[in-house]
Amino acid sequence: MDYDYEKLGLKVGLEIHQQLNTKRKLFCNCPTKIRDDEPHGEIERVLRPSQSEMGHVDKAALLESKKEKKFIYQYYNDTTCLVELDDEPPHDVAPDAVDTALEVSTLMNMKMADEVQIMRKMVIDGSNTSGFQRTMFVSQEGFIETEYGNIGVTSLCLEEDACKKIEDGKDYTKYCVDRLGIPLLEITTEPDITSPKMGKEAARRIGTILRATGKVKRGLGTIRQDVNISIRNGARIEVKGVQNLDLIEKIIENEVTRQISLNEIKEELLKRNAEVVDEIKDITELLKDTESKVLKSALKNKGVIRAILLKGFSGMIGREVQPGRRLGTEFSDRGKVLGGVGGLFHTDELPKYGITEEEVTKLKEYMNCGENDAVILVADKKNKVERALNAVIERAKESMIGIPEETRKALDDGNTSYLRPLPGAARMYPETDVPTITITEEKLEAIRNNLPEMPEEKLVRFVKEYELNEDLAKQMVMSYHVDLFESLSKKYSKIKPTLIATTLEATLKEIKREGLDTDLLTEEHLEEVFKGLSEDKMSKEAVPEVIKGFIENPTKKLDEILEIKGMTSMSVEEVESIIEDIINQNIATVNEKGMGAMGLLMGRCMAQLRGKADGKIINTTLQKKLKEKVQ
């Protein structure tokens, strides 16, 4: 939808979280390796909130504890240690992680801290075994340049990544500690972003700077974007976990739609003098004979059915606030997160789900529900139902006040769902187990003297030096394989850089689309491919099949792959002999069409010779031999 974002007073700020490709984790010597094989063991923990020195309990932490969840942590004996399990003090900070943080800070024109103090930031969702995340403030007050103008960068922090979530059950969450402790940069911008397109461009530019260092991890889950969004007469909403750059624009658009819609609902509710009745009524007996599968299942498991009355809410609960999501979805999210229930029913959508019109009539009569009123009902265990309906009552009251400040989860369709309230501001405490780090002028000077080439500079050089067209050069500059491309192009000057770039960018993607696991392919494999090509062991047409061969047989050498694929390179004499045979086999066509038979013959030659001889040599030889026959 097209909005006048300036008129709406849209303000957006980004938090970019980028994993670093360091030799070890931030506070221990374990490798930064993510695994998917069976873990060697598990531990269980329950985290409880405690008062701060000021006597306060963080509201987000308190809310999390009310879910009564236990946390299960998977570990590996050979790639994780007691530091991740919070049974051993942290080691000194990984020095290469600090250097990368300073390098990125310099590229974003930031002011460095003289001394870096490690801090503890409260974490309330169980994603850190200790209940806090270690983080350190490195720099502040910088900016990035974009086509929309400069965007301020508030701060850059170096911190440890959280555990990897494995499973989320009703009364537990399972994590793996293999990701915990991987060095992570947190880059926070000022709320200078004033349109969805500008938000996407800002995130793209920060990502470009990060990749330019060559010291960050690549792939799904290695970079995550949180987006803070607000409009005039709205509220600040923090959207967590946007992994796809292309989704940022849609997330912002849909959140603006949501806030506008919620404001419209508020105005309508106020006109109606709407009221939320606090009383929760037991309607188990009323619906004990229902044929609704959901309600019957709850009753069978010794659950209850309870309901609340929302006066003046008729038609409002079913009102859309985001594409495919309604005010009722907002209520349901609260009930699911805070009560642990599967969902709720409301009279705006009934009769439905096996609940009959007769049952709806009885329900409305029992609840004293008027024409403009609505009823919400929930079925589950008694304690869950109570928690869920109390959460819905609170959210319904908020809908008459305005838009609540929340942390919300990014969904794949560009919408968001409730996660938790915005956390309190005072969640940082000094880390007592790790000494501070002094940032010297000598260190900063060394960083400034070794800054990487920026992508826009590299693009110009690739077009000029390697004669790539601009589109391919752009792909290569942003590619994970950019360093390998340069290395191979310089090492094997006999091969055109365009072929190397196309192989790394296009051929590998095509092979992946065919269902082969290109992650099994190492740089050593690719080195062998181009080395063999430069030594005339194979033709360029053989490259895709040889790469597939390495994926299928990762331990084999090039000569073995060529043998398996039947692509050992032929001599010129062998090629000439095969082409002569093909011409003789099709002599009737040659006599009839002369040089017009070239297309047919070329197809038949390639069928026999593809991968065994260069296509140009085949073409040239065929033309020569065909001319001799025609003459």
Curated annotation (Swiss-Prot):
Say what the protein does.
Answer: Allows the formation of correctly charged Gln-tRNA(Gln) through the transamidation of misacylated Glu-tRNA(Gln) in organisms which lack glutaminyl-tRNA synthetase. The reaction takes place in the presence of glutamine and ATP through an activated gamma-phospho-Glu-tRNA(Gln). The GatDE system is specific for glutamate and does not act on aspartate.
Question: Can you name this protein?
Answer: Glutamyl-tRNA(Gln) amidotransferase subunit E
Could you tell me which SUPFAM superfamilies the record lists for this protein?
GAD domain-like (SSF55261), GatB/YqeY motif (SSF89095), Glutamine synthetase/guanido kinase (SSF55931)
GO BP, sorted A to Z: glutaminyl-tRNAGln biosynthesis via transamidation; translation
Enzyme Commission (EC) number: 6.3.5.-
Q: Which UniProt keywords apply?
A: ATP-binding, Ligase, Nucleotide-binding, Protein biosynthesis
Q: Provide the Gene Ontology terms for cellular component.
A: cytoplasm
The entry's family comment says: Belongs to the GatB/GatE family. GatE subfamily.
One Pfam match, by short name? GatB_Yqey
UniProt-listed InterPro entries: Asn/Gln-tRNA_amidoTrfase_suB/E, Asn/Gln-tRNA_Trfase_suB/E_cat, Asn/Gln_amidotransferase, Asn/Gln_tRNA_amidoTrase-B-like, GAD-like_sf, GAD_dom, GatB_C_1, GatB_Yqey_C_2
PROSITE patterns listed in its UniProt record? GATB
A single GO molecular function, which one?
A: aminoacyl-tRNA ligase activity
Annotated source species:
Methanococcus maripaludis (strain C6 / ATCC BAA-1332)
Q: Which reaction does it catalyse?
A: L-glutamyl-tRNA(Gln) + L-glutamine + ATP + H2O = L-glutaminyl-tRNA(Gln) + L-glutamate + ADP + phosphate + H(+)
**Quaternary organization:** Heterodimer of GatD and GatE.
